[in-house]
Amino acid sequence: EDYEAYSWTAHGRYPTNTPGWWGGAHPFALLQYSIVHNGEISSYDTNRRFMEMFGYKCTLQTDTEVITYIADYLLRRQKLTPEELASVIAAPFWSTIDRKPPREQEKLRYLRKVFSSLLITGPFSIVLGFEGGLMALNDRLKLRSMVVGEKDDKVYIASEEAAIRVMAPDAENIYAPAGGEPVIVRVKEGKFYGNRFFDHLAVQRDKAGHGGRAGDGAHPAHLREKLP
């Protein structure tokens, strides 16, 4: 009751492959991001080596750190949208891309080729909190559980429905996103499920608000030129 925010992240973390220490605790807060992550990143070394070429150093003994740097690099430095971030780190399979409309195929192939070293493999579910909002994402095979619910102007994201019911016993529209399908919540704009937008939900600032932002919609210059 003493704190106010439009978005909250929390995690009861049990580290299995890394030391349990305060530097790797969750929510992992760094570079204006707050990340909670359930899973194991098998592509960690590939992702880490790529990020080190751009000055990011992974020193905190948690694979969540490299996720944070990837988000910062793509969102802040490359000016991708969170939707595009999701299409990089949980990129659709090539066979899935082949079934998309031509323009979308071109964009997804471009992102996969240019940022191939930032594909995150292994089982994971992630909630990324940043200024103005939240993005939740599963690995593309959905090897970790993640559910979403809503009540009035609030959105709840958790590994299990039971956790949502603790916060909001009468939560509605409980939904399990597909693997690789981003769930993005924009403050005062609404909720975005993959390619489905629910404009009835406008997240308001209040003492127990949950929700978020999904960026400014900008494309990096090279992507704008290729995809006007």
PLM feature segments, named:
Residues 1-209, 215, 220-228:
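Conserved short alpha-helical segments that host acidic/polar catalytic motifs at enzyme active sites
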